[in-house]
Amino acid sequence: MTSDRPLKLLISNDDGISALGVRTLANTLATAGHQVTVVCPDGERSATGHGLTLHHPIRAEQVEGIFHPDVIAWSCSGTPADSVKFALSAVLKERPDLVLAGINHGSNLGTDILYSGTVSAALEGLIEGIPSIAFSLASFKACDFQPAADFALTLVRKVALNPFPLPTLLNVNVPPVSSGEIKGVKITRQGLRHYEETFEKRLDPRGKSYYWLIGEVVEDIEQPDYTHLPPEVPTDVRAIGENFITITPLQYNLTDVQGFQHLHRNSWFD
């Protein structure tokens, strides 16, 4: 993978094929000359995590008229992870250089990434050994995705020029401000968010009860350092609040090294 040729890019998301974020990302990259294939869920799939469709068929169809004319686009009835799996096995004739996800309408920070369909789409690429990047605009209200797309174009070029020794997932969050107001880019560690959540009981028009999960962030916690990074490395949550673009390298290996060492030292089962 080198920066002097067009890159083969696979893009997915969790907001659906018609979302403005994925259109802005795909069109920006295609306009720059990259070979872009988009395979997204056919509708909203936010917070579906890494779920897969196993108990009913997946339906998919090619989509025209939404993207740049050079973009090949498909919609899929499954989840974001389904979409990437389907693309890699049934749509693409060649392995992509990168798997991209987003641009998500809303942040994916801290422990929120464990629920994120956007991050899971990128993670599916990583599981297949493909470098991947998840992009999110850190606001549910802001609708200007172009600064994030412009940064995506820059970052894709940098990753092509300086490939990682092993495939890595970069989780990128962009503050919802103009390009001139972005203070810079920070390499961050994953933070921790705590929510106050309730299941609100409601009644449907027929008088039957149902429940709606509602919640809001009540605390952004400075997570204990389990990663052995220097203490001055900021969390993604803190840096995005200071209007920095955040880049957090992620992996799918969830082994707790300290927990492993504790079990080993105490010889629980020897």
Swiss-Prot record:
Gene Ontology cellular component annotations, sorted alphabetically:
cytoplasm
Q: What class of enzyme is it?
A: hydrolase
- Where does the record place it? Cytoplasm
Locate the residues binding a divalent metal cation: D14, D15, S46, N104
What are the protein's UniProt keywords?
Answer: Cytoplasm, Hydrolase, Metal-binding, Nucleotide-binding
**InterPro entries, alphabetically?**
SurE, SurE-like_Pase/nucleotidase, SurE-like_sf
UniProt name for this protein: 5'-nucleotidase SurE
UniProt lists the gene as surE
